[in-house]
């Protein structure tokens, strides 16, 4: 094999690591799993790392920035009815840019935080009066994932009807599971309802309840809780509205009401290395299901065509990804020449081409999710800097390239007899994770950390 063929082979093998345009950047994402790096200017210059959330991290979530609010309020997502909860937006901003650490409670590192919005209707809540019921569809949680922490967050406003006895005896809040088939409800929390000077979110730890629900072999897909208020002596019930609780937004069903609904925040740890491509496939399945034509293709042909149009857009993006990954080798000769006439230069200019190309180093690679057609389900970031490795690995190899012994021997043989062995390849030697906030196939907002997303250093292998 001559030097030109060897270089072309290396470039083909590494095409997923060194794409040339926005669509080819999907090869990098497919090989790893993405996470966000949000910057106020939208430049995507840096990576984002996630910290496993402890109680302090959840409480420290900041108010979402203007760009996040505009994106949340828009209709650019795959499902226009999904309004990202402010808490999840704030959580992303709070955790972005921090290195992953162990969870504060000693449970270990978590890599996924999912926000499940309350799905209880006003009628179901009225049936629980004087309490309030909450219903969450947790079926999208993978059985292979370990639930590390679960927290129920309920909005409590300043009470319009202050309890006159609150100065002496504080009423109590009782949180329990919904009655099971035998009519048994399990009390989870009992605590005093402190007086409020303004609105705030009441947080309840429901980790044990969620874990028990998942262990039950015939568990419902819905996780149900009931919040009640009683007098200090727990002898008689109180209306939750007197303490500032109640149906969000007056039951108008608007965007404000959706953002004020109760939220079940579950932190989990995956047992296997996650790939972003798994989520992409789930998104594609959800898109196909949403775009299925009606049984009667009569007058509805127009709407079917519109649905297929959206479906075609996603297919085009994914097809472009596959095409870029596959054609990267075909363009590898010419693409490799971008560094100085390498792969496509042919055998005649072999020596000159090698001298003209730069040594193995890290190069810029900007990933724009809009170009990939993923901006309808990815909330943040809209873009990020992934970097890629490019250049020649010639003898003698520099120590900062951290070559393996095999790469050293192979490079030495190649320098002595190019036809005996190809040159070693410039590849990522060290990668770091980033995080991504997105809407999953079940329309839940998920904060997830993906490994091996940003090239930190390049080496010869």
From Swiss-Prot:
Ranges of biased composition (kind: Gly residues): 323-350
Cysteine-cysteine disulfides: 360-426, 389-458, 393-460
Residues of the propeptide: 20-315
Domain of life: Eukaryota
Location of the protein in the cell: Secreted
Keyword flag Signal: yes
Glycan-bearing residues: 79
Compositionally biased residues, Basic residues: 351-360
PROSITE patterns according to UniProt: TGF_BETA_1, TGF_BETA_2
GO molecular function, one term: growth factor activity
Single biological process term from Gene Ontology: spinal cord association neuron differentiation
Keywords of the record: Cleavage on pair of basic residues, Cytokine, Disulfide bond, Glycoprotein, Growth factor, Secreted, Signal
Signal peptide limits: 1-19
GO CC, one annotated term: extracellular region
Keyword match Glycoprotein: yes
Chain intervals for the UniProt region annotation (Disordered): 287-360
Recorded family membership: Belongs to the TGF-beta family.
Summary of subunit composition and partner proteins: Homodimer; disulfide-linked.
Protein name: Growth/differentiation factor 7
Organism from which the protein derives: Mus musculus (Mouse)
């Amino acid at each position: 094999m001559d030097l030109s063929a060897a270089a072309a082979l290396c470039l083909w093998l590494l095409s997923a690591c060194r794409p040339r345009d926005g669509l080819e950047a999907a090869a990098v994402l497919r090989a790893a799993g993405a996470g966000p790096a949000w910057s106020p200017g939208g430049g995507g210059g840096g990576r984002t790392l996630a910290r496993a959330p402890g109680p302090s991290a959840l409480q420290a979530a900041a108010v979402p920035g203007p760009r996040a609010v505009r994106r949340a309020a828009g209709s650019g997502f795959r499902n226009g009815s999904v309004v990202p909860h402010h808490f999840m937006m704030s959580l992303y901003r709070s955790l972005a840019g921090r290195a992953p650490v162990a969870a504060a409670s000693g449970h270990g590192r978590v890599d996924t935080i999912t926000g499940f919005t309350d799905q209880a209707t006003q009628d179901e809540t009225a049936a629980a009066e004087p309490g309030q019921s909450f219903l969450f569809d947790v079926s999208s949680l993978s059985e292979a994932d370990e639930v590390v922490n679960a927290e129920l967050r309920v909005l409590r406003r300043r009470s319009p009807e202050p309890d006159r006895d609150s100065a002496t005896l504080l009423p109590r809040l009782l949180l329990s599971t919904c009655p099971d088939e035998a009519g048994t409800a399990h009390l989870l929390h009992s605590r005093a309802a402190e007086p409020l000077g303004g609105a705030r979110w009441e947080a309840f730890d429901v980790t044990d309840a969620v874990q028990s629900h998942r262990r039950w072999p015939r568990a419902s897909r819905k996780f149900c809780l009931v919040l009640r208020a009683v007098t200090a002596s727990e002898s008689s019930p109180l209306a939750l509205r007197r303490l500032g609780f109640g149906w969000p937004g007056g039951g108008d069903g608007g965007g404000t009401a959706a953002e004020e609904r109760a939220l079940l925040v579950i932190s989990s740890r995956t047992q296997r290395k996650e790939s972003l491509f798994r989520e992409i496939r789930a998104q594609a399945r959800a898109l196909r299901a949403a775009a299925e034509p009606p049984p009667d293709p009569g007058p509805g042909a127009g709407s079917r065509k519109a649905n297929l149009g959206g479906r075609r857009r996603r297919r085009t993006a994914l097809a472009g990804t596959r095409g870029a990954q596959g054609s990267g080798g075909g363009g590898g000769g010419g693409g490799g020449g971008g560094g100085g006439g390498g792969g496509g230069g042919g055998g005649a200019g072999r020596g000159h081409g090698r001298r003209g190309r730069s040594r193995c180093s890290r190069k810029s690679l900007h990933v724009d999710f809009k170009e990939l057609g993923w901006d309808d389900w990815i909330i943040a970031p809209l873009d990020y800097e992934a970097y890629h490795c490019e250049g020649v690995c010639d003898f003698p190899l520099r120590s900062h390239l951290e070559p393996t012994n095999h790469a050293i021997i192979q490079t030495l043989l190649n320098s002595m007899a190019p036809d005996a062995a190809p040159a070693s390849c410039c590849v990522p030697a060290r990668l770091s994770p980033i995080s991504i906030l997105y809407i999953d196939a079940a329309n839940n907002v998920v904060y997830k950390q993906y490994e091996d997303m940003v090239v930190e250093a390049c080496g010869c292998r």
